[in-house]
Design a protein with these regions (language model features):
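Surface-exposed beta-strand/loop patches in extracellular or lumenal glycoproteins
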Residues: 45-46, 53-72
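Beta-propeller domains with acidic blade repeats across secreted/periplasmic ectodomains
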Residues: 160-208
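Hydrophobic residues positioned within well-ordered beta-strands of beta-sheet architectures
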Residues: 25-27, 38, 48-50, 61-63, ...
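Short, exposed beta-strand/loop patches in secreted or surface proteins that constitute
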Residues: 11-20, 71-74, 110-115
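Solvent-exposed residues in well-ordered beta-strands and their adjoining turns
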Residues: 30-32, 53-55, 66, 125, ...
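Extended polysaccharide-engagement surfaces of secreted carbohydrate-active enzymes
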Residues: 1-56
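Short structured motifs
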Residues: 13, 33-38, 117-124, 197
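Extended acidic/polar, glycine-enriched regions
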Residues: 81-84, 88-175
């Protein structure tokens, strides 16, 4: 099909690894010259949140958020946008049941790009300071969009954006038990001896 496959060039994007602290996971990657920490989380059962810490940089970066047509703002501030789910077909008289995707941005900055007819994107401008923001994503029926608006208001009122930098500094040990085993010495009957490290088959994690 002549489409390019494989990893992107590192100066475009590069996955660096992850940090685990308790039940939280922080991804580390770069987009262009800007470093990014990202932690996924949920609000309720169906609002997915991308918590982001974006390093300073001289260039704007663009985030792909969803695929869909007919993007429109849902509130006067421009924080919440709505798109039709990609591939959805709706009869004229069943608009309330139309599958849609709604997204919201909370935090330091972020500008919705509604120009593309098939993609919803978020533009994060260049900045001399690190930026913290949260992107909330929801899918459901058009008639249920008000539930998402309430969820956005609740997230904004309940908590600030998590400190992802702090979560990369390490926390309590995940496994505190000590696993002991033995080494069986080999017979020194030749020019060298081979010792055997006995695998700890009996361990709390049943890992062997």
């Amino acid at each position: 099909d002549k489409k390019p496959y494989g990893p992107l060039p590192r100066d475009w994007a590069h996955y660096k690894g992850l940090y685990v602290q308790g039940n939280k996971v922080v991804l580390s990657y770069t987009v262009g010259s800007r470093g990014i920490f990202e932690m996924p989380s949920l609000h309720g059962k169906n609002v997915f949140i991308r918590n982001l810490h974006v390093a300073p940089g001289t260039k704007e970066i663009v985030m792909q958020v969803a695929r869909g047509a007919g993007a429109q703002h849902l509130d006067g501030s421009g924080h919440i946008v709505l798109v039709k789910s990609a591939g959805s077909v709706t009869a004229t008289n069943s608009n309330a049941n139309e599958p849609v995707i709604a997204a919201a941005v909370l935090g330091d900055t972020g500008l919705w790009d509604l120009k593309d007819e098939e993609n919803l994107r978020l533009r994060i401008p260049a900045s001399t300071k690190a930026q913290k923001l949260r992107v909330l994503i929801w899918s459901g029926k058009r008639s249920e969009v008000a539930d998402f608006s309430k969820a956005v208001a609740a997230v904004k009122a309940e908590s600030e954006a998590p400190n992802l930098m702090q979560l990369t500094e390490g926390g309590k040990a995940k496994w505190t038990e000590t696993v002991e085993t033995k080494i069986q010495s080999g017979l020194a009957t030749g020019p060298y001896a081979t010792d055997t490290f006995i695998l700890p088959n009996e361990n709390p994690w049943k890992s062997w």
